[in-house]
Every structure is written in C-alpha cells, then in structure tokens.
Regions:
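Low-polarity contexts
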Residues: 36, 42-236, 240, 246-305
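Conserved small/polar residues in nucleotide/adenosyl-binding loops
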Residues: 1-5
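Alpha-helical, low-charge segments enriched in small hydrophobic residues
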Residues: 7-10
Length: 305
C-alpha cells in the first residue's frame, strides 16, 4: 500500500490524491484535511492535529465501549454462575428430596428444583436459540436501517446509558466539525464528512437536515433546534458561534464540555452498576443455595428431635 502511495507521488499526484486512491484504508476526514492543508501550505501542522484528533477520538471510543460492555460482562458472569449451579450443583440434591415424600418442602425449593430440571433438559436448545437470536439481531442491525435506528433510539432513551451515548455522539460531532472548520474545509464538505464518520442514524438525520438547511440558505443551527438528541446548551453554543464568526472555537468548547460529561457518566456507571450487579449475583446465588440447603437442615433437625 505504501509503495503504491510513493509511486503515485512520483507521478505527480498530490498526497491527498495518493491516499484517496487507497479506498477505505484512510478515513475521509484525514483525506479532506490534507487536501485543504495542501492549498494553505499547512500540511505538517495538519498532520500533527490529526494525530492528536485520532488519539482523542480513540480514547473516547474506548471509554464508550467500556461503559456499554462492562455491565454486560458482569451480568453474563452472574448468569453463568447461576446456570452452573442449576446444572451441576442442584441436581446432586434431587435424589435426597425425592425421598422426602410428604415432607413440607418450601415452594421456593420446588421452584429451584423445577428450573434446574428444565435447564438440564433444554439447555442446548436455549443456547441455540440465544445464538440464533444474536445472529438475526446483528444481521438486522447491519442491514436494516429502520431496525438500527429503532435500536439506537431505544438505547438513547435508556436511563443512565442514554446520556452516555448522547454525550459521546455530541463530543465526536463537535470535535470533528471543529477540526474540519479550523483547517478551512468547506461547511458543506464538513457535513458530508460528518455523515460518513457517524455511525448513529439519528445523528445522521440531523446532519442531513443541516445540509438541506445550508442548501436553502439557512443557518446550520436550525437543524439542531428543539432536537431531543442534541442538548440545548450545545445548540446555543452553535448559535453563538455563528453570530460571532467563531464557530470552530465554539465547537471545540462544546466538544470539551461534553467530553467531560461523558467521562463523568462513564465513571458513574462503573461506580453504581458494579456494586448493583455484584449484589444481584450474591442474592441470586444465595437464594439458590439457601433454598436447597435450609430444608435439609430442617429435615435433619426434625429427625434428631
């Protein structure tokens, strides 16, 4: 790939053209930034800015992934432990309880025994069903726009996690937009790049609205007015940037503000969700164990009496 770029440069092509010929190997934002800097003679500064930009966006992305995946991992571990107990621990007590015909066995114990028996019979079908569901879900998410939009809408309206997604999207939008404007990329081109960069269909629609507004001679900010997915403070800062002619600077301030909110939201998730899930795991395992063990102690106490 790099040899082809070197060859393109020796044949008289510009650096941006050489990168563009590599297809999707290089992000569109990088290519357009370089294209603009070639006209202004600021290529070294632009490359330094891009290095910082991609480092910051990668850090934000990792924080976002951590916030969304960490609770899921803890929940999967909890379900795995519970399933293991049901499949390999509880069955060892079944024969004992079968000898207790007529004994007063608590309802919760009977429920645990019934659930254990159900899992032993159908665990393979349950696992196949889960895998099948995940495959169908991923296929629809990748290939059906309306389904993807619906899932993203649902996640963004979920307590706690919704704000994390919104803060992340606003941060990425503002940071990218500010960087494009600061390097003299045209607003319409900037919006088209933002559309390609974003993976959120709801924000893509906002960007499309902004492009249409620009074509009609309207301001960019009107596309973000009264939109639940775009916080009011961010909208007001865009309006201020348009009125003062300092839109790049204001977008940087928006990015910095919502990046801090995003970091705080991720920290809160780690702080509150972890103990809640640990308590859930403890309660689940405790209920299963006590429902099996306590009746046995009662039985032995009755025999000794």
């Amino acid at each position: 790939m790099y040899k082809r770029q070197a060859y393109d440069l020796t044949t008289g092509k510009s650096f941006s053209e050489a990168l563009e010929k590599q297809g999707k190997a290089f992000p569109s934002i990088l290519i357009n930034m370089i294209k603009a800097s070639e006209m202004t003679g600021e290529l070294p500064e632009t490359l330094d800015d891009m290095e910082e930009y991609f480092a910051e966006t990668e850090a934000t992305r990792k924080a976002m992934v951590t916030a969304m995946i960490y609770p899921v991992i803890i929940l999967i571990i909890a379900l795995g432990v519970g399933t293991f107990i049901m499949l390999f621990v509880v069955p060892r007590f079944v024969d004992i309880y079968k000898t207790m015909d007529g004994a007063d066995i608590p309802g919760i114990t009977l429920a645990v025994l019934a659930l254990s028996d159900f899992l032993q019979k159908y665990i393979l079908w349950i696992l196949v069903g889960i895998v099948f569901f995940l495959l169908i879900f991923l296929y629809l998410y990748k290939n059906v726009k309306s389904f993807k939009t619906g899932v993203q809408w649902l996640v963004m309206h979920t307590p706690v996690f919704g704000n994390v997604v919104i803060y992340n999207e606003v941060t990425m939008f503002s940071k990218t937009f500010a960087s494009l404007l600061a390097h003299n990329v045209f607003i319409t081109d900037s919006m088209e790049i933002l559309d390609k960069v974003s993976n959120n269909e709801i924000y893509k629609q906002l960007i499309h609205n902004a492009i249409n507004n620009i074509a009609k001679g309207k301001s960019i900010s009107t596309a973000f007015k009264d939109q639940w997915a775009f916080p009011i403070p961010a909208y007001e800062m865009i309006v201020t940037g348009e009125k003062t002619g300092q839109l790049p600077e204001m977008m940087n301030k928006v990015a910095a503000y919502y990046q801090d909110l995003h970091k705080n939201a991720v920290a809160r998730i780690k702080t509150f969700i972890e103990p809640i899930l640990i308590i859930l795991l403890t309660v689940m395992v405790g209920v299963i164990v006590l429902s099996i063990v306590v009746p046995m102690f009662n039985m032995y106490s009755a025999i000794q009496a």
